[in-house]
Amino acid sequence: MSVELNDLGRVHFIGIGGAGMSGIVRIMLARGISVSGSDAKESAGLLELGALGASVHAGHAAQNVAGADTVVISTAIRANNPELEFARTQGLRVLHRSEALAAAMAQDTVVAVAGTHGKTTTTAMIAVLLREAGLDPSFAVGGTVPALGVNAAHGAGGIFVAEADESDGSFLNYRPQIAVVTNAEPDHLDHYGTAEAVMEAFQSFIGLIPADGLLVACTDDDGALALAKQAAARGTRVVTYGRSAAAEVWLINDGAHRAIEFITPIGPQRLVLELQVPGEHNALNALAAFAVALELGVEAEQALSALAGFTGAARRFEFKGQVRGIRVFDDYAHHPTEVRAALTAARTVADGHHVLVLFQPHLFSRTHEFAAEFAAALSLADSIMVLDVYPAREDPIPGVTGELITEANAKLTFQPDRAKAIQELVARTANGDIVLTVGAGDVTEAGAAILDALATPAQEVSHGG
């Protein structure tokens, strides 16, 4: 369903406090749309949206929808939600969150960032880069960006940078002028069923690029490279990036420093690439952002300067604090490839010291599908405690627990009791070590408990922002 923002009337969001929903609300309010919404319980985020002008309610009830013309839901909202039932009974327009975001983007030049991994960081990099270049983009990112202070905002520049989520196929609601594909691997098989269906969805996504549009794709990833070849074969303009000299934006790492080489009208140009965020995966994300910036008219030196100042996105190798020389980080990684990238980065940051991990599997279906791959990726750490599965939207699968991962590798320890897992992990730490909480569930809350466990009365905790 394709709709214009001004046709929506008064918009009611069910689950307004969610990260993705609240970002769209901010943008709609800034663009003069009347907004109401509800969430399961009162929170600081709910009160903040109320202060911005939304009519907000704690708890779900049919009367909350009164006066609305359009109702917005996410995949997490169940069919028996009383507000959704009321909306359908009354014949109100019901949009998925992605359709509402598409309506908000309809009048702008859309940069949509897709990929199994790296979407949030790459989207954040592009938004920060374009803002610092004075292009004043609107943006919607999957996590809060410290440099921007929020995860979404309205800009007056006529450019909209959006993270395009493939998990439920909703990225097919967007109409990108510039599409970025960081990688394309099997994931979210609970929705797609097969790896082939995942790739078909990505093929459909790049098929949305108009004749005068652009695909930016990573040559390091087989899936993204295949998509680039398919797009080029049907006449779509493609810019590739990666560690291969065949890429048009080329990452060079000679050991002493990184550089970026790219094609200009007068021939190849090479400049130093400096980043605060660790890991080769983030260097590749930076190349994607750089390629988009060049396409939108940003000077190369200005783009690299902005990237050098980029400090990351929330829950993407985010520093949480330090006690007794032991640093604690948090990462959203929830796929084996992401876990491997996070731990490779942690190894670099640890500089020879130990890396200890508290991992929480996310989704029963993903744990069942990738147990052995998770075990292999986690084994890059020196000490690994595995919690039980964070179910999110899923019902349990018989026989599938966090222990399924530890069975594949004796180096891993299954401990479903989080407090005991933290206690065991902290007991193994020494000065200079890194502790990393990993997963897309509520394991992020463990960072504070780890810092508390590390602290003693004589030592003060240094918390990260």
Swiss-Prot record:
Alphabetically ordered keywords of this record = ATP-binding, Cell cycle, Cell division, Cell shape, Cell wall biogenesis/degradation, Cytoplasm, Ligase, Nucleotide-binding, Peptidoglycan synthesis
Q: What class of enzyme is it?
A: ligase
Which Gene3D superfamilies does the entry mention?
A: Mur ligase, C-terminal domain, Mur-like, catalytic domain, NAD(P)-binding Rossmann-like Domain
Q: Which residues form a coiled coil?
A: none
Its recorded reaction(s) are:
UDP-N-acetyl-alpha-D-muramate + L-alanine + ATP = UDP-N-acetyl-alpha-D-muramoyl-L-alanine + ADP + phosphate + H(+)
Q: By its UniProt entry, which Pfam families does this protein fall under?
A: Mur_ligase, Mur_ligase_C, Mur_ligase_M
Q: Source organism's superkingdom?
A: Bacteria
Q: Name one GO biological process term.
A: cell division
Q: Where in the cell is it found?
A: Cytoplasm
Primary location group: cytoplasm
Name the pathway it acts in: Cell wall biogenesis; peptidoglycan biosynthesis
Residues involved in ATP binding: G115, T116, H117, G118, K119, T120, T121
> What are the recorded GO MF terms, alphabetically?
ATP binding; UDP-N-acetylmuramate-L-alanine ligase activity
| Enzyme Commission (EC) number | 6.3.2.8
An example GO CC term for this entry is: cytoplasm
Q: Which PANTHER family does the annotation name?
A: UDP-N-ACETYLMURAMATE--L-ALANINE LIGASE, UDP-N-ACETYLMURAMATE--L-ALANINE LIGASE-RELATED
Function summary = Cell wall formation.
NCBIfam families referenced in this protein's UniProt entry, alphabetically: murC
Extract the HAMAP family matched here.
MurC (MF_00046)
| Family that this chain belongs to | Belongs to the MurCDEF family.
State the name under which the record lists this protein.
Answer: UDP-N-acetylmuramate--L-alanine ligase
Q: Which organism is it from?
A: Renibacterium salmoninarum (strain ATCC 33209 / DSM 20767 / JCM 11484 / NBRC 15589 / NCIMB 2235)
Taxonomic placement: Bacteria, Bacillati, Actinomycetota, Actinomycetes, Micrococcales
Which gene name does the record give? murC
